[in-house]
Amino acid sequence: MILRKKIELFVLPEFTEIQFEGFHRFIKYGLVKELNDFPKIEDTDQEFEFQLFSRQYQLAEPPIEERDAIYQSITYSSDLYVPAQLTERKKGRVKKQIVFLGSIPLMNSQGTFVVNGVARVIINQILRSPGIYYNSELDRNGIPIYTGTIISDWGRRLKLEIDGKTRIWARISKKRKVSILVLLLAMGLDIEEILGNVCYPKLLLGCMKRKTKKEHLQSTEDAIVELYKQIYCIGGDLNFSESISKELQKKFFQQRCELGKIGRLNLNKKLNLDVPENENFLLPQDLLAAVDYLIKIRFGIGVPDDIDHLKNRRVRSVTDLLQDQLKLALNRLENSIRQAIRGANRREHLPTPKSLVTSTPLITTFKEFFGSHPLSQFLDQTNPLTEVVHKRRLSSLGPGGLTRRTASFQVRDIHPSHYGRICPIETSEGMNAGLVASLAIHAKVDNWGSLESPFYKISGVSEEEDMTFLSAGEDENYHIATGNCLALNQTNQEEQVTPARYRQEFVATAWNQINLRSIFPLQYFSIGTSLIPFLEHNDANRALMGFNMQRQAVPLSKPEKCIVGTGLESQTALDSGSVIVATEGGRISYTDGRRITLLTKEKEVETKLVIYQRSNNSTCIHEKPRIQLREYVKKGQILADGRATAGGELALGKNILVAYMPWEGYNFEDAILISERLIHEDIYTSIHIERYEIEARVTSQGPERITREIPHLDNYLLRHLDESGLVLPGSWVETGDVLVGKLTPQETEESLRAPEGKLLQAIFGIQVVTAKETCLKVPLGGRGRVIDIKWIYQEKTSTTYAEIVHVYILQKREIQVGDKVAGRHGNKGIISKILPRQDMPYLQDGTPVDMVLSPLGVPSRMNVGQIFECLLGLAGDFLQKHYRVTPFDERYEREASRKLVFSELHEASRQTANPWLFESDNPGKSGLLDGRTGDIFEEPVTIGKAYMLKLIHQVDDKIHARSSGPYALVTQQPLRGKSRRGGQRVGEMEVWALEGFGAAYTLEEMLTIKSDHIQARFEVLRAIVTGELIPKPETAPESFRLLVRELRSLALNLDHIIVSEKELRIKFKDI
């Protein structure tokens, strides 16, 4: 194969570029535009005039650094200052001041926003582009209905339709519609103009004939009145007035007919109009052209639109979302200033610009947006890959978008226009499948919100190949060769037949017909999917699971890079911000665990390292230096590794020696058997940091106090507290230990009920105020080492005084039975048993296997990539090599992956003199010995080095047992859930199981005493303490009494009657 001589080489883009570019556009253009649009404000008497000089705005530098904002739990933001002028026209006085409009949260170097000390990310939304879309559908009777939907920039819609009787309507709502003639006349057109600009004017004439003389519309005024009556459902006679016209303009035309720049471009292109781009509203001629096109489609001229095509969608990035919020905030500010000017007019003193402008609208609007908007999300910080993927996410949900329940399968499905723009594999599992997607590696968003993908142009004249970016609508008319086919030999390329894409179809065509070719085999996939080696050998569903589980991988205390990868690991780690890189060349003058100092030619650069910091997902963020003192480094060289990185590469898991074989049923149903070596050598040990919070407020009875003096509790529980009542850093705390001592004053009435309180008040007249303890204690499963205590917030105002204390506890978790582990190919399982090393199956050189996987998990799941990976990993382990294999290597030759694996295994066998590594009779398999008996297993077994991940689904977070705890007030049954110390109900099927075994007494206990029999509970406790027999309950349980009460509330009386056998007397007894 001979490659072309001159090719413009591609480089991988920065993975978080979409976030930085979006925020840059907001600061540079969006902010200026919205400030420029702020109007001059006058009072009703036109005595005062207020205006902002938006071009001279200033954004102040943030007063603190990003890291300090996280530590102090405040927002990393910049203050916005704008010069303002207030003019008093009567006296000719002018006051100019620089006013503070508010704070705008700033994007940090990671591409996220720090709001109240928490990292948040703004998701890019993908939704219908404003414009017009035509469609045809069948009604209930099977008659085709042709529709044209005009989507405004606000997301509101105006629907035109031709029904089965060829009448044309404009639909106002689901139930109401108005004749198109009424709407066109109301917009200012006359009948002659309407009929002269549509094909088949008979259709519109037919609409006119159906109207009686009384209903016939003579003028625009009549049409406006008719439209107003239809929209507001008003009957009877109504006369035209200017107020009706203004109301219609405001409520109907302005909301449904504002197209925006993108909508105007789309409409001009679709309907072949020549309207200026700055005309953002729907004009009468636009609607007339839309009706004309709809009539043409009815008669077979023109093609309906594909709603799901990406050319009909646009991406709302950070720019648009923040600009919308700024617009809303400035509207609120405008209303506030108008009210302030009105108030100042009534008073005598002259206001100043500073007294009129308040920062509240801007601050509260952005606070609401970042706190509660569905597209502003809590950054997923489980590992570095998760952060990068979260920033590149595309969501169809949110305001103006789709909803989980109403979205159809068609919307969720993969579309041919997604190729190279949206990853066909990466999406959520469950309700959000297909609605939340991810950008492909090389995709980017242009200024109009369209997704673009790069291609090489192929020219017959020149040998050069230039790169060009095309959107989804632009590449339809080209033959595009796929990225996983090689450039062909120059001599016979014209004779070669190449697979290509053309007009949303896959075709085979001659090379001389090809116009463009893809630049990279992984161009179609997202970052997470591209990290799966031998991706082409996996079923897409398992690849999806493999990616989703990489996002859930917990950073380990000793990271290890994979033997078999795809080559994208280093850039993923770099773009996530987890590794620290030298910004300039120089010499390391100082390094320790907390900082690195680099001496360059001009200056000394100090970099602070992050030490044991908690992430949003309670995993540990920790950076370790990789360089030595006095070492010379180049620009771009790695100075420090972060969590889940090793040598500057992403390292989410460990290379583990695995065997695919059954072992005594312990790997039934995907369960996994592991060696105790993984525990003793801390191979799967991870560090987790939990944060516990307590707040001391001023209550109506007095202030809450943080103190060490807690008389209610045993001194043993308070042993770790210092003099001020806070736990000492470095203390090892167990469940129930007090972290922060706090006393809350009780109400006086409650204090009076205590006998000693009454006595003291009667004798000495002392009012006794008692306090109850509301200490912060270590919850169940929260044991660990206290690493930090923060007084986060201390604010004194006229009404409140609050103190917030955060306590951070570090836990070191080893792998254990019940933890979930997974590979990169969707092969997941739960640890079922931990075996001693000597009992594990071992190789012919005596090495015990670390993990035993079920072989039945491979054929039915069709994820054969894991076998290629583990065999190549085994060869790499013996040869001391690392492999970076780009997926789709079959483009070189058939069976390329298999040939690579077997050749490397053969080479490893030859170099290490281990013939069992590659046996020609059973390639890829080897004889394995039983660790318990020393006998060889009957069948050869597939063994290899697989890269296995420990996932965040850990048994410590999930397992829960209850001996006693709280009960629900109504049913008197135990509460539900681990957080409430609840229990589990015995349901119908569990009762059947106990009945089947005849466990009558156990069943009775579960349904009464252990569940909801209040009286029996106390009797059982007394019987256990005194050693008596447990009495049989005589009364009904609470759930039965509840049922009776509910029946009584429905006027159905249910009584308990006892009939005496001797006297035959009836005795009523309350249930």
UniProtKB/Swiss-Prot annotation:
Official protein name in the record: DNA-directed RNA polymerase subunit beta
Function, in words: DNA-dependent RNA polymerase catalyzes the transcription of DNA into RNA using the four ribonucleoside triphosphates as substrates.
Gene Ontology biological process: DNA-templated transcription
Catalysed reactions, as listed in the record: RNA(n) + a ribonucleoside 5'-triphosphate = RNA(n+1) + diphosphate
Keywords of the record: Chloroplast, DNA-directed RNA polymerase, Nucleotidyltransferase, Plastid, Transcription, Transferase
Cystine crosslinks: none
Coiled-coil intervals, chain numbering: none
Pfam families documented for this protein: RNA_pol_Rpb2_1 (PF04563), RNA_pol_Rpb2_2 (PF04561), RNA_pol_Rpb2_3 (PF04565), RNA_pol_Rpb2_6 (PF00562), RNA_pol_Rpb2_7 (PF04560)
Localization per record: Plastid, Chloroplast
UniProt xrefs under PANTHER family: DNA-DIRECTED RNA POLYMERASE I SUBUNIT 2
Assembly and oligomerization: In plastids the minimal PEP RNA polymerase catalytic core is composed of four subunits: alpha, beta, beta', and beta''. When a (nuclear-encoded) sigma factor is associated with the core the holoenzyme is formed, which can initiate transcription.
NCBIfam families: PRK00405.1
GO cellular component, as recorded: chloroplast; DNA-directed RNA polymerase complex; mitochondrion
GO molecular function, one term: DNA-directed RNA polymerase activity
Annotated family: Belongs to the RNA polymerase beta chain family.
EC number: 2.7.7.6
